[in-house]
Amino acid sequence: MATTPRTFQLVAPHLTGEDIRAFQRDLSARFEAWDINHRVADDGDYDGATRDAAEQVCKGLGILHEKAMEHGVTPELRIRIRHPEQRTPQEVARSESASAKVFRAKLRERFKDAGKTLTGIDVSNHQPNVDWHAVKAAGHSFAFHKVSEGIGSPDREFGRARWKAMRDAGLVRGAYHFARPQKGRDPKAEVHEFLRLLEQAGGLDDGDLRPVLDIEDFGQAGRLTPEKTHAWAHGFVEEVQARLGKRPIIYTGAFWRDQMGNPDDNLDCPLWLAAFVKDPKPFVPRAWAHESFSILQHTDKGGCPGIAGNVDLNRLPGGQAALDRLRI
């Protein structure tokens, strides 16, 4: 049976008109998929909703808030959800009493540290000596380490001792694989190589970050067509899903646009965006236009206590809750 779409109303008085219009465009596709009409209202308050509707709105607010963080603003958010069915005043009161508590609790939990930005590093054999406790003491919350590249090229610095040291220092740790699809190998074989080397080092524990597919410029030699490259990435993602029960994080940047044709399909994976620019609104591939990036790698020439020389630095908007959503 068809249902009348619910109405979602948002108040964001601290945003400019152009920001609001940009948010409206970004949210449209997502809310249409949920059959929820949305608009910016001059005022709004909470009328009551089912648990399911509250869940949907919290998801929408999460997207909106992450967009707001990119603009450096914190919007004031108010919600009105109306149901089309006719109810008596007593029924409405009962609905509001129960569901408003659920909604407010979820909203408080979702945004308790949403304005915070966490930082982290990623390393490889280019950083042969790392004092992980110094990295943690410098304020970083997470760290990624390269494990493998293609097949037959393990990272020479990655191993059991370093993998354990990352965790022992109190960092949320993650591992990444540098893809070599132009070599013509089955993506399943690269997943096998990646996870085999990771398992030799102790494997993934509960609370580690999801594994990462690093897909970026791999030179002209043997370059695949955009369609074949995307198909290869899809095969890698599906094999990780089959092996671990989780979608990996995808690390990419302008490569997704320039050498993959900027496809719309993000393979249902979070984005770790590489954008070494000072622009507060870096290019985000079209496939993630409605979610934006989860992690931003903003420089490959950063500095960090405990590491000699340059190191990649990353920002993760949304605080601890956003970090937790990327963990296995």
Model-identified regions with their sequence ranges:
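Functionally critical loop-and-helix segments that line ligand-binding/catalytic clefts
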Residues: 90-125, 133, 257, 264-328
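Non-Sec secretion/translocation targeting segments of pathogen effectors
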Residues: 1-4
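Substrate-binding cleft of extracellular glycoside hydrolase catalytic domains
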Residues: 113-243
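Sec/Tat-exported extracytoplasmic proteins
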Residues: 27-35, 58-65, 81-85, 139, ...
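Catalytic domains of cell-wall/extracellular-matrix polysaccharide-remodeling enzymes
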Residues: 208-286
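Short acidic, glycine/serine/threonine-rich helix-capping segments at coil-helix boundaries
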Residues: 6-95, 99
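Surface-exposed patches in mature extracellular/periplasmic domains of secreted proteins
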Residues: 35-42, 66-69, 175-179, 204-211, ...
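Extracytoplasmic/secreted envelope proteins and their assembly/folding machinery
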Residues: 17-24, 51-58, 74, 78, ...
